[in-house]
């Protein structure tokens, strides 16, 4: 069983449409109007409806009320900034910290060129990119967990 719906080129109705320049002359269904006109609006409206419904059914607050006269003991950024916060906190030289943060996107830009020799799309057949992804994910999670700890345990996570 195939995932793609291939057209039956022996069908006379389809051949007549193709002769007039209508329809599509390759496998699958056309994006217009099937996806763009019918499927996408349903998905977008469904997502908006789910978000509004969940906000109405469970109106939770975003946290405790702020007190401008009381400073918290330790100020932490939002959770998605934990790895970069920990990286800047652990590296003593500010210039090296900023350069290490700039090296992340620069390194990610080089991965397609390193793996360009391999034309496979299966990630298990692209070992360099898969290895870089897995190591980067582990390092990011490690730095994110370390950002919530005191600075002397930020790299070792208190394990060593």
UniProtKB/Swiss-Prot annotation:
Family recorded in the similarity comment: Belongs to the cytochrome b family. PetD subfamily.
Subcellular location: Plastid, Chloroplast thylakoid membrane
Record membrane topology: Multi-pass membrane protein
Keyword Zinc assigned: no
Protein name according to UniProt: Cytochrome b6-f complex subunit 4
Keywords annotated in UniProt: Chloroplast, Electron transport, Membrane, Photosynthesis, Plastid, Thylakoid, Transmembrane, Transmembrane helix, Transport
Keyword Transferase: no
GO CC terms, sorted: chloroplast thylakoid membrane
Lineage, opening ranks: Eukaryota, Rhodophyta, Bangiophyceae, Bangiales, Bangiaceae
Primary role: Component of the cytochrome b6-f complex, which mediates electron transfer between photosystem II (PSII) and photosystem I (PSI), cyclic electron flow around PSI, and state transitions.
Subunit structure: The 4 large subunits of the cytochrome b6-f complex are cytochrome b6, subunit IV (17 kDa polypeptide, petD), cytochrome f and the Rieske protein, while the 4 small subunits are petG, petL, petM and petN. The complex functions as a dimer.
One of the record's GO molecular function terms: oxidoreductase activity
Predominant location: plastid
């Amino acid at each position: 069983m195939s995932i793609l719906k291939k057209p039956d080129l022996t069908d006379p109705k389809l051949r007549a449409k193709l002769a007039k320049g209508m329809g599509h002359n390759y496998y699958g269904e056309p994006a217009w109007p099937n996806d763009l006109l019918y499927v996408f609006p349903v998905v977008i409206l469904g997502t908006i409806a789910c978000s509004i419904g969940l906000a109405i059914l469970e109106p939770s607050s975003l946290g405790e009320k702020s007190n401008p006269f009381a400073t918290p003991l330790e100020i932490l950024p939002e959770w998605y900034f934990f790895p970069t916060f920990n990286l800047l906190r652990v590296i003593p030289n500010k210039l090296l910290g900023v350069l290490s943060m700039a090296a992340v996107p620069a390194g990610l830009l080089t991965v397609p060129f390193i793996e360009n020799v391999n034309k496979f799309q299966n990630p298990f057949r692209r070992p360099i990119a898969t290895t870089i992804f897995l190591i980067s994910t582990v390092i990011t999670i490690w730095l994110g967990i370390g950002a919530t700890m005191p600075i002397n345990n930020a790299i070792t996570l208190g394990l060593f």
